[in-house]
């Protein structure tokens, strides 16, 4: 509808379009975005012919699982700070990635509202508020599209959340499989990280609460930088069950397999705050420290750990730990050992541990313990050594318990008794073994240890009766086993 044919006439435009190839249409209104067909669009626009930059209207687009509504200065975004209000809905971030000609991961449904303005070769969304499943975000996002010089699309974002849940950024199949008992401890699901190679990203992020697997965190802070195909998460910090968590991650996606450097530290985990709804005997006391460092290559978690180098250690300080407590994901290997290293704990719903150290050095996917698995419990002292093949997940650990005097267990009844912790990480099994068979296996080391460690002499088991503190001695052996590797955690002495 036109007021007249004069250049100053007002107009009112209503337009509906269905298109199999909508690039030219969308490019006319929003040149920084592309949409795959088929597309349905509705446009309403009002203004004057000689003042087209002041024309205002509404654009509704529906295409391939993405719905976008733009309100405001449709013809002049980017000029004189003209802005558009935006509302966007899609069933996955991956579809949103196609909207901006970039690769983004799968996710739960997405809803975004904000104010958009043009900025050079890109757009800026101010006062952005968006939800991904149960996770909420607010802040500002800048998107710079692929330019003529071949530079990658870039995203700069400053975001905060009241709540974040990692499962909102997983596929339905991944979320469903997480609820099933795993046949294998380490996932062989292929890592899909094309978005790291395809985009440059700088993200500053804070969350009041965050859930990642079994991790329930508070006050999460991180800076993520993706540049030239490399992802760097520089010291993620959060509070978790009273402990301070620090995580760093470097991942090179420019090559296959991916090159990964990972560090995880949890200091002062309070056992009383560890549980997530389990009914166990109270009170629970004590603290646990955990540290894991890994370097490896692979296209799945299984491939990465199969040839990884590094170490993993847990230090326990005077703790009552429930045997059936739900376990934090990165520490489950250590807790699998803790669950089975004390054969006399089955009758009790909690571990009464005065001190403990569970330490492994990891070389080429083999986790070795040179008598660096030690527990001093109420009834018994335990020393163990052996190996875990992270590629096959097979466990071969020798366990020697010794009853503590005056605590109701006959020292004679334990004389010469050894146990073998076998099976796999997903299904560990403890079996009693004769001293002759077990000591022969430990002495030869051929079946259990292939790294050339010769310190597993059978006499070390007999040192359990030494006057020294079993935890302190195990800590000294772990320092030696690491051979100069940085180890910042120390066990409580006595």
Labelled PLM ranges:
Residues 4-5, 32, 147-148, 281, ...:
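Short proline/glycine-enriched turn/loop segments at secondary-structure junctions
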Residues 9-12, 81, 143-144, 152-155, ...:
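Short "repeat-start/strand-capping" segments in structured domains, especially the N-termini
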Residues 149-169, 302-304:
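Flexible beta-edge/linker motif
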Residues 24-26, 95-97, 137, 166-170, ...:
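Outer-membrane beta-barrel proteins
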Residues 1, 28-31, 39-73, 91, ...:
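Solvent-exposed beta-strand/coil patches in large extracellular/periplasmic or lumenal scaffold regions
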Residues 399-403, 412-420:
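Soluble, non-transmembrane catalytic domains of enzymes that act on hydrophobic metabolites at membranes
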């Amino acid at each position: 509808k036109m007021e007249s044919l004069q250049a100053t006439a007002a107009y009112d435009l209503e337009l509906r379009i269905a298109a199999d190839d909508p690039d030219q249409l969308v490019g006319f209104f929003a040149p920084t975005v592309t949409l795959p067909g088929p597309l349905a669009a509705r446009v309403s626009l009002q203004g004057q012919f000689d003042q087209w930059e002041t024309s205002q209207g509404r654009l509704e687009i529906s295409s391939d699982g993405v719905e976008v509504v733009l309100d405001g200065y449709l013809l002049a975004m980017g000029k004189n700070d003209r802005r558009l209000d935006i509302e966007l809905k899609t069933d996955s971030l991956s579809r949103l990635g196609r909207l901006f000609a970039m690769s983004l991961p799968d996710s739960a449904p997405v809803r975004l509202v904000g104010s958009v303005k043009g900025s050079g070769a890109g757009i800026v969304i101010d006062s952005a508020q968006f939800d991904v499943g149960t996770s909420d975000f607010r802040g500002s996002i800048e998107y710079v599209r692929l330019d003529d010089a071949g530079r990658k699309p870039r995203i700069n974002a400053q975001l905060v959340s009241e709540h974040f849940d990692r499962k909102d950024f997983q596929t339905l199949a991944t979320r469903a499989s997480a609820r099933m008992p795993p046949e294998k401890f380490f996932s062989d699901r292929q890592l899909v990280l094309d978005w790291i190679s395809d985009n440059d990203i700088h993200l500053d992020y804070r969350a009041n609460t965050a859930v990642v697997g079994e991790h329930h965190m508070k006050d999460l802070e991180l800076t993520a930088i993706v540049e030239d195909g490399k992802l760097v998460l520089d010291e993620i910090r959060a509070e978790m069950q009273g402990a301070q968590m620090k995580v760093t991650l470097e991942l090179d996606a420019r090559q296959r397999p991916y090159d990964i450097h990972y560090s995880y530290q949890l200091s002062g985990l309070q056992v009383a705050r560890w549980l997530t709804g389990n009914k166990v005997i109270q009170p629970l006391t004590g603290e646990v420290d955990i540290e894991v460092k890994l370097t490896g290559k692979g296209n799945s978690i299984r491939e990465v750990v199969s040839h990884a180098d590094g170490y993993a250690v847990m230090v326990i300080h005077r703790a009552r730990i429930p045997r059936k407590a739900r376990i934090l994901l990165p520490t489950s290997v250590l807790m699998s050992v803790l669950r089975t290293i004390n054969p006399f704990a089955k009758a009790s719903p909690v571990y009464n541990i005065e001190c403990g150290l569970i330490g492994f050095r990891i070389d080429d996917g083999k986790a070795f313990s040179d008598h660096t698995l030690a527990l001093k419990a109420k009834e018994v002292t335990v020393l163990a050594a052996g190996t875990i093949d992270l590629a096959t997940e097979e466990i071969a650990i020798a366990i020697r318990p010794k009853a503590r005097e005056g605590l109701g267990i006959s020292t004679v009844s334990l004389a010469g008794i050894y146990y073998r912790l076998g099976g796999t990480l997903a299904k560990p099994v403890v079996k009693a073994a004769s001293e002759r068979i077990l000591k022969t296996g430990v002495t030869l080391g051929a079946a259990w240890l292939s790294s050339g460690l010769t310190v597993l002499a059978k006499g070390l088991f007999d040192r359990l009766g030494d006057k020294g503190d079993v935890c302190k001695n195990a800590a000294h052996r772990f320092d030696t086993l690491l051979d100069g590797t940085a180890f910042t955690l120390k066990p409580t002495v006595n």
